[in-house]
Curated annotation (Swiss-Prot):
GO terms for molecular function: 4 iron, 4 sulfur cluster binding; 4-hydroxy-3-methylbut-2-enyl diphosphate reductase activity; metal ion binding. Belongs to the IspH family. Keywords: 4Fe-4S, Iron, Iron-sulfur, Isoprene biosynthesis, Metal-binding, Oxidoreductase. This is 4-hydroxy-3-methylbut-2-enyl diphosphate reductase. The gene is ispH. Binds 1 [4Fe-4S] cluster per subunit. It comes from Mycobacterium ulcerans (strain Agy99).
């Protein structure tokens, strides 16, 4: 008898034997919430507990429809700009970070601010300020219009040039070849970013690297796990929202690593049964802003379709935890 591991899903188990002819799910580990998302979501929850609703949140706290809808039902009010927040009210800044001008606008309206910016995004902000003080040209690799990019660029608007994909490389101009550095959005594809850096370095031989890797540990870990399982997958399902950069990148990584097909789904109801025709192995993962309950829903739906064996594919163990913002930490 093939030994199995109970996965806590009706009808699903993880076999330690390779049975390629039986319908199965390869489940990426790690997946889902990263430390920054966990901190941001808990920040809004704690603010609601401490102050009661409404608690205003500038932009989606994280890029996931389920999370935003759940917090909205609990009393969070999501706005695009601080001028939509009543004077003197509480406003939480999202995990993606904000530019200094946003803090200034909040202060003018006497808003009580709680900063849920991911500490790894804050690190990139600090790097941008430091290099700007030293009069560097900063080449920021990222997606135009993404909240994180807007926030980072806002730290040093006169020094930052956005490089959005390989096409953006040729548009870059610099003042001093000895004073040019690249930084990046934290949720990009590692491979694509390194390709852009290599192209930039062909133009600017003295291009400096950031002091430490800007692409966050969770983004990298989730991409590595997908790369490990994709070659064995007929189909990869990435649980995540379409405005989630890191989730979209996982679909691209899966296809690039050998999966025959890959799709982004917000939840189980998004699965098109035609995708499963002729499919033996389905890979499942989730973006860094996705709660595990949505992954469980997908696994249950797959089990109903005969994919009742779940095999974990573990490439890293994550233990990092970030402290909550001081404004909502429990009293000692």
């Amino acid at each position: 008898m093939v030994p199995t591991i109970d996965m806590g899903i009706p009808g699903a188990s993880s076999s330690v034997a390779h049975v390629p002819t039986r319908r199965r799910v390869l489940l990426a580990e790690p997946r889902g919430y990263c430390a920054g998302v966990d901190r941001a979501v808990e920040t809004v929850e704690r603010a609601l507990e401490k102050h009661g609703p409404p608690v205003y949140v500038r932009h989606e706290i994280v890029h996931n429809r389920h999370v935003v809808d759940t917090l909205a039902k609990a009393g969070a009010v999501f706005v695009e700009e601080t001028d939509q927040v009543p004077e003197g009210a509480i406003v939480v800044f999202s995990a993606h970070g904000v530019a200094p001008t946003v803090y200034a606008a909040a202060a003018e309206r006497n808003l009580q601010t709680i900063d849920a910016t991911c500490p790894l995004v804050t690190k990139v902000h600090n790097e941008a300020r430091r290099f700007a003080r030293n009069d560097y040209d900063i080449l920021l690799i990222g997606h135009e219009g993404h909240e994180e990019v807007v926030g980072t660029a806002g730290e040093a608007p006169e020094h930052v040039q956005l490089v959005d994909g390989l096409d953006g490389v040729e548009r870059v101009t610099i003042r001093d070849e000895d004073k040019v550095v690249w930084l990046s959005q934290t949720t990009l594809s590692v491979d694509e970013t390194m390709e852009i850096v290599a192209r930039l370095r062909q133009r600017f031989a003295k291009l400096q690297d950031p002091p430490s890797d800007d692409i966050c540990y969770a983004t990298q870990n989730r991409q590595v796990a997908v790369k490990a399982m994709a070659p064995e997958c007929d189909l990869v399902l990435v649980v995540g929202s379409r405005n989630s950069s890191n989730s979209v990148r996982l679909v691209e990584v899966a296809l690039g690593a050998g999966a025959e097909a890959a799709y982004l789904v917000d939840w189980a109801d998004d699965i098109d049964q035609s995708w499963l025709q002729g499919v033996t192995t389905v890979g499942v993962t989730s973006g860094a802003s996705v709660p595990e309950v949505l992954v469980r829903g997908v696994l249950e739906r797959l089990a109903e379709s005969g994919y009742d064996m779940v095999q974990p594919v573990t490439t890293a163990n994550e233990t990092l935890v970030f402290a909550l913002p001081r404004e909502i930490r429990p009293a000692r």
